């Protein structure tokens, strides 16, 4: 995995992402940390985790995340709900592709340390959102859209919407 940090973020946010990277590298020793301005150093077949709303690679790789996200003006749409990036932090995993792609966006620099601590406990989910206080407001599996166990009889692909369930334990 390559954790790609945003070079265009404000200084305080860049420092918070550097702390995030250090924490995760202690937990995951094989994690490579790279700056989004040094994309030539990233192999074409690399698994990527993009950090920060201002990450330069979001423009290039973000298309794969569009299967689970949408936009409503400036807000992100996840599971039919709107989340603004000024008061919500999100973590997303692309539901398909030969190589893994993830994105972590923080509401602000102060939210990043708690994401470093919390996200490893939510690794089975493909979509997460946290409010400004750090409380989890969405945890959902990413839809499976490209599986050998799936066959589409038409060109149009539709996603199955499962009913919302309340967790047995919070």
Describe these PLM feature segments.
Residues 1-170:
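Solvent-exposed alpha-helical segments and adjacent loops
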């Amino acid at each position: 995995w390559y954790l790609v940090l945003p070079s265009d973020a404000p200084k305080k946010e860049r420092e918070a992402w550097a702390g995030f990277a250090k924490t995760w590298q202690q937990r995951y020793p094989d994690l490579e940390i790279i700056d989004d301005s040094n994309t030539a150093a990233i192999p074409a077949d690399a698994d990527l985790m993009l950090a920060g709303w201002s990450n330069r690679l979001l423009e290039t790789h973000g298309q794969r995340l569009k299967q689970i996200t949408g936009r409503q003006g400036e807000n992100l749409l996840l599971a039919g709900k709107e989340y603004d990036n000024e008061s919500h932090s999100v973590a997303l995993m692309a539901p398909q592709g030969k190589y893994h792609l993830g994105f972590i966006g923080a509401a602000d620099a102060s939210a990043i340390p708690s994401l470093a601590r919390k996200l490893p406990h939510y690794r089975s989910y493909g979509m997460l959102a946290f409010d400004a206080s750090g409380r989890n407001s969405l945890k959902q599996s990413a839809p499976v859209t490209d599986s050998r166990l799936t066959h589409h009889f038409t060109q149009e692909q539709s996603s199955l919407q499962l009913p919302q369930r309340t967790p047995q334990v919070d």
